[in-house]
UniProtKB/Swiss-Prot annotation:
One of its GO terms (molecular function) is oxidoreductase activity. Pathway: Mycotoxin biosynthesis. The gene is VicYa. The 2 HXXHC motifs are conserved in ustYa family proteins and might form active sites. A motif (HXXHC 2) lies at residues 95-99. This is UstYa family oxidase VicYa. GO terms for biological process: mycotoxin biosynthetic process. It comes from Bipolaris victoriae (strain FI3). Its EC number is 1.-.-.-. Keywords: Oxidoreductase, Virulence. Pfam families: UstYa (PF11807). A motif (HXXHC 1) lies at residues 60-64. Belongs to the ustYa family. InterPro entries: UstYa-like.
């Protein structure tokens, strides 16, 4: 877990985490993939970019989770000493609110029915760790995204 979670100590730590999170992503421009004949899919809205390019939801969710962790890290490290008014480029409450909503939708859409029990002695409730979950085949999803990528960039948050 510590490989992907901030220890709230420095910008250098967050830069290392950003690189690790980027390695979780397929080789695509963030979340954009090319869809042939989108008019053949009645549920698709207009593409986000011409080509036509569409956003893949699981990437968007991972992006939002990283963004929220980054904002929380910034708040913990800079908030108490008055630097909370000094917001770095890329930070925004609108983006943060959007990411909370994306993750809410994800939770309600996937409705993971894993039964969690057995909490850690220091935790009042369940930690959620150590339980068997049924997941999608990650490699199949990555292969499809890389095959249909718009270009060869990788990013977790646009810098």
């Amino acid at each position: 877990m510590d490989l992907y979670i901030s220890n709230y100590t420095s910008d250098d730590d967050m830069a290392i985490l950003r690189r690790r999170w980027i390695e979780l992503l397929p080789l695509v421009v963030g979340d954009i993939v090319h869809v042939e004949n989108p008019e053949g899919y009645s549920y698709l809205l207009d593409p986000i970019i011409p080509g036509p390019g569409y956003v893949v939801t699981w990437y968007h969710q991972l992006h939002c989770l990283f963004f929220l962790m980054s904002e929380y890290d910034r708040l913990l490290r800079h908030g108490p000493n008055g630097k909370e008014r000094s917001i770095p480029a890329g930070s925004s409450s609108i983006h943060t609110r959007h990411c909370f909503e994306i993750l809410r939708h994800s939770i309600l859409c996937h409705l993971d029915m894993t039964l969690e029990g057995g909490s850690a002695p220091f935790f009042n409730g369940t930690t959620g760790f150590g339980h068997a979950h049924v997941c999608q085949n990650r490699q199949e999803a990555i292969d499809w995204m890389e095959k249909n990528r718009a270009n060869d960039n990788r990013m977790i948050i646009r810098a």
